[in-house]
């Protein structure tokens, strides 16, 4: 086992690329849960919603979606992550395929961005996760 402890390391950055969406609700809570934990451990965390993941940024979707019956809504997980300092990006090129316009997007999204931004985030981060 390593002698290093997470608090002994310099600041870390993590990018979570999330392509899961409403068709796979059981995959939608964990990325936000993990990101909140990482951010509370002083990591700089970004989540990039792409492909079907952009649907989670649509008003009314995450508010009415749970990963498991009787569980917290996905928007609650998203808000927990935001409260911990996680930045949330939404893929602009994916929006037309899901008939989304900027006026449809929830306030929790920090930035509507292109794939170049996602590539920059991935290349600059210490760790990347894909859901």
Q: Which ranges hold each PLM region?
A:
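N-terminal beta-loop-helix "entrance" segment that forms/cooperates
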Residues: 53-67
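Short internal beta-strands
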Residues: 44-50, 88-92
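C-terminal binding/interaction regions
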Residues: 108, 112, 116-125
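A glycine-rich helix N-cap at a beta->alpha junction
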Residues: 64-92
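Anion (oxyanion) recognition and catalysis
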Residues: 39, 82, 122-123
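Short, glycine-rich nucleotide/cofactor-binding loops
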Residues: 14-29, 62, 68
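Positively charged, low-complexity intrinsically disordered leader regions
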Residues: 1-9
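Histidine-anchored nucleotide/phosphate-binding helix
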Residues: 28-43, 47
């Amino acid at each position: 086992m390593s002698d290093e402890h997470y608090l002994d390391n310099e600041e870390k950055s993590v990018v979570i690329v999330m392509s899961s969406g409403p068709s796979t609700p059981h995959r939608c809570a964990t990325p936000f849960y993990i990101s909140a934990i990482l951010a509370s451990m002083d990591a700089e965390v970004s989540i990039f919603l792409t492909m079907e993941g952009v649907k989670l940024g649509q008003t009314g979707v995450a508010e009415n979606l749970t990963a498991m019956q009787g569980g917290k809504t996905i928007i609650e997980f998203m808000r927990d992550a935001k409260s911990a300092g996680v930045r949330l990006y939404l893929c602009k090129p994916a929006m037309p395929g899901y008939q989304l316009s900027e006026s449809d997007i929830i306030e929790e999204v920090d930035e509507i961005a292109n794939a170049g931004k996602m590539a920059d985030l991935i290349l600059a981060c210490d760790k990347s996760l894909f859901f």
